Every structure is written in C-alpha cells, then in structure tokens.
Regions:
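Walker A/P-loop
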Residues: 3-39
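A short helix-loop-helix "switch/interaction" segment in the helical subdomain of ASCE P-loop NTPases
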Residues: 14, 192-205, 231-237
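Short glycine-rich substrate-engagement loop in P-loop NTPases that contacts/grips substrate
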Residues: 36-71, 115
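Conserved AAA+ ATPase "SRH/arginine-finger" region at the nucleotide-binding site
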Residues: 40-42, 136-137, 144, 161-174
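Conserved P-loop NTPase "ATPase switch" module shared by AAA+ and STAND
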Residues: 62-113, 126, 138
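C-terminal alpha-helical interaction modules of replication/initiation AAA+ assemblies
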Residues: 133, 141, 148, 207-267
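Short regulatory helix/loop adjacent to the ATP-binding pocket of P-loop NTPases
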Residues: 140-160
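Conserved small helical "lid"/interfacial subdomain of P-loop NTPases
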Residues: 165-193
Length: 267
C-alpha cells in the first residue's frame, strides 16, 4: 500500500483463537499510522453495514488529510468472518444506498443479521481504495461449509486476498512469554508453576496472558504450582480480583460449586 493499491488489496488471516491475528492486524495499522474501522461478530455485518464501513474509510482520509499530502489510509478490519452467515446473493444497490444514507427508512425493509454481507464484502475487496484485513478461525466458514458452491466462493475471494496462516504457539514460546511477564511484573515463579500455566493453555497465548493477569493479582512475590492449580483449576482464592480477570476465571470453572466460589471473590 506504500506504492499504491496492490493487485490483492486484502489479507486473510487464518488460525485458531488466541494466536494474535487481530493483534497483528492492529499492530500493522499502528506501524503504518492507519486509522482502523473494525467489524466483528457482535456487530451487524450485512450489506449496509459493510458499505457504511467502506464509505466511512474513504471519507475519513479526505477529511483529515494535510494539504499537499496524500490522504491517510484507513484499515478496514473484519474479525471472525467465518461466522458471516448467508450466501453470495447481492442486495440491490438502491436498497443498500438508501440504508446507508438513511433515506426512506422503512423498518420492514431493514437488512437483518448478515443479509448480503458476503456479496458486499466481495464488492468491497474488488473496489476498495483502503487496506482490508479479514480474520477467521476456519476459512470454510467463509466459503460456505454446507454449500455445494464453496469452491466458487473460495476462488472469488482468493482473487482479492493474500492468505496468511497462524499456528498455535509452542510450549517453549509460551514458557518464555510467561516468564517475561512474571519478571516484568516484579514477581518470580517456580518452574512447576510455569509448566502448569502452559499445560492449561495449550497453544493459546491470549488465554495464557489472561491467566497470568489473574495470577499477578493474587501473588505477593513468588508463584508456585499449587497456587496455579488452586486458582486456575478450581477458582478458589483468598483475595478478591478485578472484574475482568475474575470473570474469565468464573467462565473457566468446571463445576457450579467452583463457579460460585469464583464469583464470590470478584472485586
């Protein structure tokens, strides 16, 4: 994008949860000094919503450009695109335009869920003047796992996308990261404690960091294997923890009794 629009303007990041796909996308945007417009599974991602994101990305640069310079780029980031439902049937251009502009709004004609989202995403990739990154766990969800035309969908998307596959972090990498986090937080840890953390989060860097956040909120100086087992596996703790690490531990509890104990420790 430094030299202009490339032939394939989008990236498709594929990999299991917690390996850093979205983090890498945001880091690229930060390094390139791009703004970010993000749509994830919790947002409406129908044809109108995707068209709005594309329109906003195009106008944002022209609004904030310095005279005599090129307008800044805006990264359009769509996370969890394997959860984008529906086929490739397009919504009429007039209908999308009226939804985007807000003109003649009729709730009965509003697009529901992801209606027309995949087709509009293809249009976005074909016409975009801004970088696009898609992230997913399983590309077959995007192509249409249950559709007999999934190969056609794959080929149509692949014309506009460079695919990058992410792998789960190795145990050795997780150990190095855990030790670094513990050290930078001013604590020490027994080797058995680090092994227990790694074994509880096989290949999942995001989950490891969350567990480390919980552990660092509980220990005074040194982390032991027993402390990890007690708090990660059973959710029992003697002190309160902040709400978000505590909720994560609550959701990971394996029994109702342990979940109740974890909930009582929330700060």
């Amino acid at each position: 994008w430094k030299e202009g629009r490339p032939n394939k303007p989008g990236l498709l990041l594929i990999g299991p949860p917690g390996v850093g796909k979205t983090t890498v996308a945001r880091a690229v945007a930060a390094d390139m000094e791009w703004q970010v417009i993000e749509l994830n599974a919790s947002d409406a991602r129908n044809a109108g919503a995707i068209r709005k994101a594309a329109t906003h990305a195009s106008t944002h640069g022209s609004l904030f450009m310095t005279p005599g310079t090129k307008p800044p780029r805006t990264l359009i980031l769509l996370d969890e695109v394997d959860h984008l439902s529906g086929g490739l049937r397009e919504i009429s251009a007039d209908r999308i335009s009226s939804i985007v502009s807000g003109e003649d709004f009729d709730d009965s004609k509003a697009l529901k869920g992801d209606s027309g989202g995949k087709a509009e995403l293809l249009n976005l990739l074909a016409d975009t003047r801004q970088p696009v990154i898609l992230a997913c766990n399983d590309e077959m969800g995007l192509w249409g796992r249950t559709s007999s035309t999934w190969r056609t969908a794959r080929d149509r998307f692949s014309k506009h996308l460079i695919t990058i596959r992410f792998e789960r972090a190795s145990n050795e990498a997780l150990r190095r990261i855990a030790l670094r986090v513990i050290k930078e937080e001013g604590f020490t840890a027994d080797p058995g404690a680090i092994d227990e953390l790694v074994n509880n989060n096989p290949g999942d860097l995001r989950a490891l960091v969350r567990d480390l956040q919980v552990m660092c909120s509980l220990i005074d100086s040194n982390l032991t294997r027993e402390m990890v087992k007690e708090n990660i596996e059973t959710g029992v703790r003697d002190t309160s923890v902040e709400i978000f690490p505590g909720l994560d531990l609550l959701y990971r509890s394996r029994t109702a009794q342990n979940a109740m104990k974890a909930s009582r420790s929330l700060d």
